[in-house]
């Protein structure tokens, strides 16, 4: 059992617990949000659910080496990394850089992602925190992807060239 992949999976699970709570609360307290805001939040929750599957499978693979198939881990970690970076970009782009404590003076339109709750400032802060933890989750998945690539290459998953001449015995 290797320690570094195990620590990475636990870090991913901690970030996922926090993200599930934050984004789940945004969904639960949704009151007449715009369609584009709902789509961004729902996509983020889809990415979180996918990340749960990858992190739990990675945790099982880190504990039980017989389950760890390097190519499968590589594909799972690559997919989770890709979806996490897309969700982080979507949340950051849709949110912008607001002052969540002073939304009255902001110039955002009625379709802005933080509008659509009884307490828009709370929703704004939860989405801000969700964006930060999505980027932290990306760092953890990127590290796991790097380890998966190294493991895949170590087990002979890549094409290696070696000496092709055989020794001639006279």
Question: What are the functions of these language-model segments?
Answer:
Residues 1-6, 66-67, 108, 112, ...:
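Intrinsically disordered terminal tails
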Residues 2-19, 23, 37-98, 137-151:
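Signature of small four-pass
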Residues 22-27, 123-128, 153:
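Charged, low-complexity, helix-prone segments enriched in Lys/Glu/Asp/Gln
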Residues 27-31, 89-106, 155-156:
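Juxtamembrane interfacial secondary-structure elements that flank transmembrane helices
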Residues 32, 64, 71, 100-103, ...:
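Residue-level signature of transmembrane alpha-helix interfaces in integral membrane proteins
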Residues 32-44, 115-132:
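Juxtamembrane membrane-interface segments at transmembrane-helix boundaries in membrane proteins
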Residues 98-123:
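Short acidic, low-complexity segments enriched in Ser/Thr/Gly/Pro
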């Amino acid at each position: 059992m290797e320690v570094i992949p195990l620590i990475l999976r636990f870090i991913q699970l901690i970030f996922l617990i926090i993200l599930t709570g934050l984004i789940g609360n945004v969904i639960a307290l949704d009151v007449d949000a715009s369609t584009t805001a709902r789509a961004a939040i729902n996509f983020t929750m889809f990415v979180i659910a996918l990340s749960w599957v990858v992190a739990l499978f990675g945790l099982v693979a880190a504990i039980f080496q017989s389950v760890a198939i390097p190519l499968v881990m590589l594909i799972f970690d690559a997919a989770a990394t890709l979806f996490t970076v897309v969700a982080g970009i979507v949340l950051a782009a849709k949110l912008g850089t607001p002052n969540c404590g002073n939304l009255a003076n902001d110039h955002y339109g009625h379709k802005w992602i933080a509008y659509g709750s009884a307490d828009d400032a709370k929703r704004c802060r939860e989405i801000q925190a969700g964006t930060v933890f999505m980027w932290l989750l990306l760092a953890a998945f990127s590290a796991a992807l790097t380890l998966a690539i190294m493991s895949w290459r170590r087990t002979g998953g890549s094409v290696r060239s070696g000496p092709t001449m055989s020794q001639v015995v006279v």
